[in-house]
């Protein structure tokens, strides 16, 4: 079990070898250190987003990969819809919270779509805060953004990283059928740790139901989910979570290291090694059968490293269906 002392976990790739997880309370291990974000492309995206009054999860959630993602040849960002204030208070998340956030910007879907079209990216991730104060949880706002973007630039591939819409399956289906290419919703952690990690209004079975219903709502839709490691989960619990997600029809599974954003958030129980993340990638693809697993200390559910593979996968699927 991962905990406040050094933990030894079996390396499934070789007989008898082990991988040691680092105990918490130490300096951040070298594989988690990133340079401060800067650069011409970074500045361009930052100014573009600010000028259009768009929010990104890259900034709001203090993502460690923002410098890398924003400084690529084309640069990519995960745009956060429906404002920057969430109606829930998960204990791992740095996004602002309030039970009465400001109303959504009605111009946001069009502004977002036009901005993305101008960036010239081939793959974009749209996400949002939870908006339990809106009857449909923001599903139509999300869907309108997707529809507008596809109208302006049909070639762009769109991933939507969604809330659970309070279990409203009509809202799930509405977004799933909006024209997006990947429907992502995160279970966040293993089943045992759900109540400790997530807001009480979220739960494991509801998240699995959302993923299952999205998959059933549109033929050919790719589904995706993610969990954080380093919160005290056990290996067998991770395997069980993978199996449950696969049974719910999930195609893509990602795993990354939990990092405590502020002292008020949950502490890190363990820094999981890169070698262990490599094991989970192999296990997920070769044993569980996911089409793709992104697994690494700095991998996040919307991290660009996986997008190159996913983009190729989606375009191949389209060719197989006879689409252009």
Swiss-Prot record:
Q: Does the keyword Chloroplast apply?
A: yes
Binding locations of [4Fe-4S] cluster 1? 58, 63, 69, 302
- Which superkingdom, per the lineage? Eukaryota
Reactions catalysed according to its record: [[Fe-S] cluster scaffold protein carrying a second [4Fe-4S](2+) cluster] + N(6)-octanoyl-L-lysyl-[protein] + 2 oxidized [2Fe-2S]-[ferredoxin] + 2 S-adenosyl-L-methionine + 4 H(+) = [[Fe-S] cluster scaffold protein] + N(6)-[(R)-dihydrolipoyl]-L-lysyl-[protein] + 4 Fe(3+) + 2 hydrogen sulfide + 2 5'-deoxyadenosine + 2 L-methionine + 2 reduced [2Fe-2S]-[ferredoxin]
The UniProt entry's sequence similarity note says: Belongs to the radical SAM superfamily. Lipoyl synthase family.
Note on how the cofactor is bound: Binds 2 [4Fe-4S] clusters per subunit. One cluster is coordinated with 3 cysteines and an exchangeable S-adenosyl-L-methionine.
PROSITE patterns from the xrefs? RADICAL_SAM
Instruction: Give the pathway listed in the UniProt entry for this protein.
Output: Protein modification; protein lipoylation via endogenous pathway; protein N(6)-(lipoyl)lysine from octanoyl-[acyl-carrier-protein]: step 2/2
Give the organism the record lists.
Answer: Ostreococcus lucimarinus (strain CCE9901)
TM ranges are none
Q: What is this protein called?
A: Lipoyl synthase, chloroplastic
